[in-house]
Amino acid sequence: MDSTDKKVQVASRLPVPPKRKYVSNDENQEQMQRKRLRSSLESELPAVRVAASIATSKPRAAPVAALPKPQVIGRQSLAVMRPKNSGPGITSTSFSGKTKVSSSVTQPAAIGAEKKKRAAWDLKGQVNDMRDTVSNYKGKMQNLTGENARLLNSKEKLQREVEVLASENSKLSQERCTLESQLREVRQQVSTFEREVARLTELCQRQEKELSSHTNTIEELQGANAILTKQLLDKEVKLDCVSGENTSLKHTVNEQTDEIAALKVCLAEKDTEVHSLDTERRRLHNLVQELKGNIRVFCRVRPTLTPERELPAGHISFPSNDGKAIVLSKMEESHIGREKKDAVKYDFNFDCVFPPPCSQESVFEEISLLVQSALDGYPVCIFAYGQTGSGKTYTMEGPEDVTDDSMGMIPRAIHQIFSSAEELKAKGWQYTFTASFLEIYNETIRDLLINRPDKKLEYEIRKVNSANMLLYVTNLRYVKVSCVEEVHELLKIAKANRSVAKTAINDRSSRSHSVFQLKIEGENKQRDLKTSSMISLIDLAGSERLDRSLSTGDRLKETQCINTSLSTLGMVITSLCNKDSHIPYRNSKLTYLLQNSLGGNAKVLMFVNISPLEENFAESLNSLRFASKVNECVIGTARANRK
C-alpha cells in the first residue's frame, strides 16, 4: 500500500439489494453456496467501527476488490472450503481424501483484543490497521483462489468419473434388466419343466400299470392261444373228415336241386289243380245251396222262460225226426155252447225246424255254408221274422251277457268269415272288410255307430253310380275292420244305441229294424281274380196286432210303421216269386235298402221265430203262414260277383 497518508471516505456498510436476475435452480443453489462461503469468511474479520464520514485531505482508497466466486460442486467440496478454527494454521483436506493441501495463513492479532482501540481522531492509525487487514485478506484470498483452482480440477476429474460411473451404472442397469428377464424366463421354464416332469411321472405310472395289465393279458392270451392252437389242430382233423362228407353232400344237393325243380313243376301243376278243385268246390257248394233253394226258411221255437213255466204251452209239436216239420194244434169250442170239438192241427214244413232245446251253435251250423257263400262272392241276406218277444234278437245277436256258447248268428258269422279269409291267404286271396250298422225306425234311417247323432244329418239311400245297382246311405258311417274284435266293439255300440220300448206283450221290445252289413272285397293277384259281395244280417222289429199290443201314442205309430214295412217285405218276396215286372222295393226303406240282397243274385235265409206260449197262438200261426208263403218262392239262380 502507498505510504502517503490519504483520507479515505468509508462507504456505508448497510446492505444494498443487488439487481437480481432470474436464475435456474442449479444456479440458485450455486449462489447460495457462495453466499455461505462469503458469510463464513466475513465472520472471521474483526469488527471495526468506522465513522460514517472522515474529514481528511487524503484521496479515497480504492474499494476492496470483490472476492471471486468459487464453483462449488457439492457438500464435500463445500466442507473443504469451510476451514475449521484449529489454531493459527488452517489445514484443508482435498475431496474424497485423495489430495491433502496444507496452508498456513498468518492471522493478525485480534484487532481490539491485543491492541488498544485507537482514538477516534487517530485516523491514520485506523487506516494503517485497515491496510494490514486488507493485506492479510489478500493473502488469504490468493490461497483460496489456488485452493479453488485445485478444487475445480478435482471437480472436473470427479465429473468425468461420475460420467464414467453413470455410463457403467446404465450398462449395469441394462444388464440387470436383461438378467432379470432371463431369470423370469428361466423360472417359467423351470415351472414348465416341473409340470412336465409331474405329467410324465404320472404318465409313467399309468404306463407301468398298463404294462402290468397288458403283461397279465398277454399271459392269459398266450394260455388261450395254446388252447386254441390245440383246438385248431382238432378242427383241421375234423375239417378233413367234413371235406369228404361235403363232397358227398354236394352230389346229394345237386340231386335234390334237380328233384326240387321237378317238385316245383309238380307244385305248379298241383296249384293249378287245387285252383280248379276250389273252383269246382265253389260251383258244387253253390249248386247245393241252389238245390236247397235260394230262399230258405228256418223255424225256431224259443224255450220257455222262468216266469212262463206255469203258463200252458203244449200246442206245438214236432211229429217227424227229420227236423223239418212243426204242428200247431188248438181245441175249438162250439158257437152255441161250451161243448169242445176235436183239436184243429196246422201242419207246416220248412227247410229246418229248431225245437226249444237247440243251441246257438247247432243253429249256426245250418247257416255256415250260406255264410261261406259270401266269401265266394255271392250276396247273402239273413233276417229274423216273428212277433215281439219270440227270440229274434237273441237268435241274431245273443243275450245281454253274451258268452261263447250264447253268441248269436251275427258274431258267429263274422268269426267264420275272418277265419276263412285267413285260411284263404295260403291260396293267394286277400280280403278287405267294411262294416256298417243302422236301424230303420218309423221309416227313418239312424246310424247305430254314432253315440250322439246329429239331428240335422239326413240319411238317404242312393245309387253309387248309374252303371250298376250298388247302393249306399248318405252320411252313414262305414268302418274298415280287420279283425273279429273290432266288429264286436261295433256290435256293442250298436246294441246300446238301438231303439227299444216296453209294450203290453214285451217289456223290452225292439221298435226298429236293425241292419248289419259287411262288404267283402277279395283279390287273388296270382290268378288275377276279384270278388265283391255283401252279407246283410237283419233283426226285424216284432210284428204284433194292435188289439193285443194295446199301443197308443208313439207306440201306436211305431206298430203301424213296423207292420207296414213287414207287409211290404212280404209283397216284395211274393213279387219276386211271381217274377212280376215291377217289384215294390220303394214302398219301404227296408226293402229299398235290401233290394240287392233279395233279388235274383242273392241267397236269402229267413228265420221265423215263434213263442212257445199258447196265448200267442194267433201271432205264431200268422208268422208260420207268412214263412210258409216265403218258403214256396223261387227267385232264380244266384250268381257270384266276380271280375
From Swiss-Prot:
<dbReference type="GO" id="GO:0005874">
    <property type="term" value="C:microtubule"/>
</dbReference>
<feature type="compositionally biased region" description="Polar residues">
    <location>
        <begin position="88"/>
        <end position="101"/>
    </location>
</feature>
<keyword id="KW-0175">Coiled coil</keyword>
<feature type="region of interest" description="Globular">
    <location>
        <begin position="1"/>
        <end position="116"/>
    </location>
</feature>
<feature type="region of interest" description="Disordered">
    <location>
        <begin position="81"/>
        <end position="101"/>
    </location>
</feature>
<feature type="domain" description="Kinesin motor">
    <location>
        <begin position="294"/>
        <end position="633"/>
    </location>
</feature>
<feature type="binding site">
    <location>
        <begin position="386"/>
        <end position="393"/>
    </location>
    <ligand>
        <name>ATP</name>
    </ligand>
</feature>
<dbReference type="GO" id="GO:0005524">
    <property type="term" value="F:ATP binding"/>
</dbReference>
<keyword id="KW-0206">Cytoskeleton</keyword>
<keyword id="KW-0547">Nucleotide-binding</keyword>
<dbReference type="InterPro" id="IPR001752">
    <property type="entry name" value="Kinesin_motor_dom"/>
</dbReference>
<feature type="coiled-coil region">
    <location>
        <begin position="117"/>
        <end position="296"/>
    </location>
</feature>
<dbReference type="GO" id="GO:0008017">
    <property type="term" value="F:microtubule binding"/>
</dbReference>
<dbReference type="GO" id="GO:0005737">
    <property type="term" value="C:cytoplasm"/>
</dbReference>
<comment type="similarity">
    <text>Belongs to the TRAFAC class myosin-kinesin ATPase superfamily. Kinesin family. NCD subfamily.</text>
</comment>
<protein>
    <recommendedName>
        <fullName>Carboxy-terminal kinesin 2</fullName>
    </recommendedName>
</protein>
<dbReference type="GO" id="GO:0003777">
    <property type="term" value="F:microtubule motor activity"/>
</dbReference>
<dbReference type="InterPro" id="IPR027640">
    <property type="entry name" value="Kinesin-like_fam"/>
</dbReference>
<dbReference type="InterPro" id="IPR036961">
    <property type="entry name" value="Kinesin_motor_dom_sf"/>
</dbReference>
<comment type="function">
    <text>Promotes mitotic spindle assembly.</text>
</comment>
<dbReference type="InterPro" id="IPR019821">
    <property type="entry name" value="Kinesin_motor_CS"/>
</dbReference>
<keyword id="KW-0493">Microtubule</keyword>
<keyword id="KW-0963">Cytoplasm</keyword>
<keyword id="KW-0505">Motor protein</keyword>
<dbReference type="Pfam" id="PF00225">
    <property type="entry name" value="Kinesin"/>
</dbReference>
<feature type="region of interest" description="Disordered">
    <location>
        <begin position="1"/>
        <end position="42"/>
    </location>
</feature>
<dbReference type="GO" id="GO:0007018">
    <property type="term" value="P:microtubule-based movement"/>
</dbReference>
<keyword id="KW-0067">ATP-binding</keyword>
<dbReference type="InterPro" id="IPR027417">
    <property type="entry name" value="P-loop_NTPase"/>
</dbReference>
